[in-house]
Swiss-Prot record:
Family according to the record: Belongs to the universal ribosomal protein uS11 family.
Coiled-coil features, chain-numbered ranges: none
Domain of life: Eukaryota
A single GO molecular function term of this UniProt record: structural constituent of ribosome
Protein name per UniProt: Small ribosomal subunit protein uS11y
UniProt feature, compositional bias: Basic residues: 141-150
Cellular compartments per GO CC: cytosolic small ribosomal subunit
Length: 150
C-alpha cells in the first residue's frame, strides 16, 4: 500500500439558471389560466416545454369558494415571482387564457390581480398575449334549445 494521501479536486459549483451578462434579462413565459373556479400561474421556459413553477389560487387559500379570488391569485403570483428569482428568471412574457371554447371567453376575477402582483414583485413584463381558445365552429353549448332560464 502506498503511503501518499489522496487529494480531492475542488468541484465546480452548479449554478441554477442561465449565464447572463450584467443588465441582461432572462425571460420565461407565464401562462395565466383564469377561470371562474381557480387561477393557475404556470411558468415555463421560452419553448414552453420545461415547467419551472406552477402554483394555483387553490394552493394558497383554505376555502373552495376563494380559489378564483383576486387575493388567492395575488398570493400565488407572489410565490411564483419569488421562485422565478431563485431560478434566475428576471422577466416574463404573459399568456393569459380564459376558459374559452364554447364556454365563457372572459378571464376570471384572478387574472388582473395575478398580472399586477407579478409586475409589483419586481418581474419585468415583456409581451402580454391573450391565448383564449376561440372556436371556429363549436360543439353545441349546454343549456338546450330554449337556453338557461333564470
Amino acid at each position: 500500500m502506498s503511503g501518499r494521501k489522496k487529494t480531492r479536486e475542488p468541484k465546480e459549483e452548479n449554478v441554477l439558471g442561465p449565464a447572463v451578462r450584467e443588465g441582461e434579462h432572462v425571460f420565461g413565459v407565464a401562462h395565466i389560466f383564469a377561470s371562474f373556479n381557480d387561477t393557475f400561474i404556470h411558468v415555463t421556459d421560452l419553448s414552453g416545454r420545461e415547467t419551472l413553477v406552477r402554483i394555483t389560487g387553490g394552493m394558497k387559500v383554505k376555502a373552495d369558494r376563494d380559489e378564483s379570488s383576486p387575493y388567492a391569485a395575488m398570493l400565488a403570483s407572489q410565490d411564483v415571482a419569488q421562485r422565478c428569482k431563485e431560478l434566475g428568471i428576471t422577466a416574463l412574457h404573459i399568456k393569459l387564457r380564459a376558459t374559452g371554447g364554447n364556454k365563457t371567453k372572459t378571464p376570471g376575477p384572478g387574472a388582473q390581480s395575478a398580472l399586477r402582483a407579478l409586475a409589483r414583485s419586481g418581474m419585468k413584463i415583456g409581451r402580454i398575449e391573450d391565448v383564449t381558445p376561440v372556436p371556429t365552429d363549436s360543439t353545441r353549448r349546454k343549456g338546450g334549445r330554449r337556453g338557461r332560464r333564470l
